[in-house]
Amino acid sequence: MAGVLKKTTGLVGLAVCNTPHERLRILYTKILDVLEEIPKNAAYRKYTEQITNEKLAMVKAEPDVKKLEDQLQGGQLEEVILQAEHELNLARKMREWKLWEPLVEEPPADQWKWPI
């Protein structure tokens, strides 16, 4: 793994991460662990799992920070870490909300009809 290449991200409030590969591996693994608790047929799990596995494979395969940033196409690795933290929070909320379950009550017949 390449050492720290910069002293600042140039983004207010976003500090440089000294171990971005390790941090991303941990976050992506946690996301996948949470997704395991969501049914396999849930769209959120299916697509998020696919994207997260792809990103995790890139992190494991590319030791160079700059090349990894280019592959992930999410900005600086610190920004990618922030995105992964947000995805982990969302995955936990999706697990809690159980959006794959049927609605408690039927929606109104013309709920999505427009114009009224």
From Swiss-Prot:
Instruction: Tell me which residues bear N6-acetyllysine.
Output: 30, 46, 60, 98
Which GO terms fall under molecular function for this chain's record? NADH dehydrogenase (ubiquinone) activity
**Entry GO CC:** mitochondrial inner membrane; mitochondrion; respiratory chain complex I
Keywords recorded for this protein, A-Z: Acetylation, Electron transport, Membrane, Mitochondrion, Mitochondrion inner membrane, Respiratory chain, Transport
Sites of N-acetylalanine modification: 2
Let me know which tissues express this protein, per UniProt: Expressed in all tissues examined with highest levels in heart, skeletal muscle and brain.
Annotated membrane-spanning segments are none
Tagged with keyword 4Fe-4S: no
The protein's topology relative to the membrane is: Peripheral membrane protein
What is a biological process (GO) this protein takes part in? proton motive force-driven mitochondrial ATP synthesis
Pfam families in UniProt = ETC_C1_NDUFA5
Modification type N6-succinyllysine: residues:
98
- Major place of localization? mitochondrion
Q: Does the keyword Signal apply?
A: no
Cellular localisation: Mitochondrion inner membrane
Q: What PANTHER family does the database record attribute to this sequence?
A: NADH DEHYDROGENASE [UBIQUINONE] 1 ALPHA SUBCOMPLEX SUBUNIT 5, NADH-UBIQUINONE OXIDOREDUCTASE 13 KD-B SUBUNIT
Q: What does this protein do?
A: Accessory subunit of the mitochondrial membrane respiratory chain NADH dehydrogenase (Complex I), that is believed not to be involved in catalysis. Complex I functions in the transfer of electrons from NADH to the respiratory chain. The immediate electron acceptor for the enzyme is believed to be ubiquinone.
Q: How does it assemble?
A: Complex I is composed of 45 different subunits.
Q: Which family does it belong to?
A: Belongs to the complex I NDUFA5 subunit family.
Name listed for the protein in its UniProt record: NADH dehydrogenase [ubiquinone] 1 alpha subcomplex subunit 5
- Origin organism of this chain? Homo sapiens (Human)
